[in-house]
């Protein structure tokens, strides 16, 4: 059984302050152009943004720990048998079986479909060596109502998709550091209870193979941010990015990479993998 983190690994509260990048709403729908990876990979969005300093709380100090249906994210201990995540294409079936065994008991549901693995680093050298993408340093959520439903239809055959869409489904990211602890450019998640719909805006997402949507977010003094200091490869952060249930539980946790001012100058770069999956009920 995979244990939820108790938040006691760090005895010291490592809350910090940093700037996060918020959307400045305009008259036109923003367009996000997904990068192809590599040394020059960077965010490309045709919209205006502002960098706002916020408090980023130490999630390990939360008692009780955060959970998917309240805050929209939760931390778990999870040891993977994958030795080299840069070879994930050759080990997908193995890792996806691990993820299924982890996530289904946590969320419930009848079927889980893993459909994407994205590797990221804040090091140009590492991005170039492995042709991977940049850390996503803008406040966002991966799906809108429309794009979540479209993704189901993209991945399942017509009859199965329409049958699954009649019931609840959830999209979750499983994020983990793949080398040493994630100290440089870690991930921070916003408590879903602190995010108002008036601050969330649909954005077109254009990639080489398809067009979809994601959500960008404008600033609010109500937002409550959390991160888990020094996440290692034996921990995973589950982040809810869509939930079709309309019963008061969290539907998503907006998130972003941020500059960690507590990180030593010589700390190793961030290297991470995020795996996206759908859970059907």
PLM features: what roles do these ranges have?
Residues 9, 28, 39-40, 250, ...:
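Compositionally biased, intrinsically disordered low-complexity regions
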Residues 1-18, 280-281:
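Basic/polar N-terminal segments that are highly enriched at the extreme N-terminus
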Residues 14-229, 266:
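Non-heme Fe(II) oxygenase catalytic core, chiefly the N-lobe of the double-stranded beta-helix
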Residues 215-281:
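Catalytic core of Fe(II)/2-oxoglutarate
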């Amino acid at each position: 059984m995979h244990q939820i983190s108790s938040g006691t690994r760090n005895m010291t509260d490592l809350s910090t302050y940093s700037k996060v990048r918020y959307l400045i709403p305009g008259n036109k729908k923003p367009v996000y152009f997904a990068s192809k990876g590599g040394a020059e990979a960077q965010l490309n969005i045709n919209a205006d943004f502002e960098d706002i300093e916020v408090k980023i709380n130490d999630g390990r100090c939360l008692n009780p720990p955060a959970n998917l249906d309240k805050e929209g994210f939760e931390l778990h201990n999870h040891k993977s048998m994958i030795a080299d995540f840069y070879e994930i294409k050759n080990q997908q079936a193995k890792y996806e079986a691990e993820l299924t065994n982890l996530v289904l008991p946590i969320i419930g549901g009848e079927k889980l479909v893993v459909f994407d693995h994205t590797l990221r680093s804040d090091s140009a050298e590492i991005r170039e060596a492995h042709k991977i993408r940049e850390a996503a340093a803008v406040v966002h959520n991966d799906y809108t109502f429309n794009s979540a439903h479209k993704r189901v239809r993209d991945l399942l055959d017509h009859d199965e998709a329409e049958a699954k869409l009649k019931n609840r489904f959830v999209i979750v990211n499983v994020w983990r550091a793949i080398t040493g602890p994630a100290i440089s450019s870690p991930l921070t998640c916003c408590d879903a209870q602190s995010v108002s719909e008036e601050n969330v805006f649909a954005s077109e997402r254009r990639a080489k193979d398809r067009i979809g949507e994601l959500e960008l977010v404008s600033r609010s003094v109500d937002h409550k941010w959390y991160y888990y200091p020094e996440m290692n490869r034996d921990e995973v952060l589950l982040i809810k990015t869509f939930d079709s249930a309309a019963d008061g539980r969290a539907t998503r946790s907006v998130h972003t990479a941020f500059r960690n001012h507590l990180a030593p100058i010589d700390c190793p770069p961030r290297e991470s993998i995020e795996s996206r999956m759908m859970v059907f009920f």
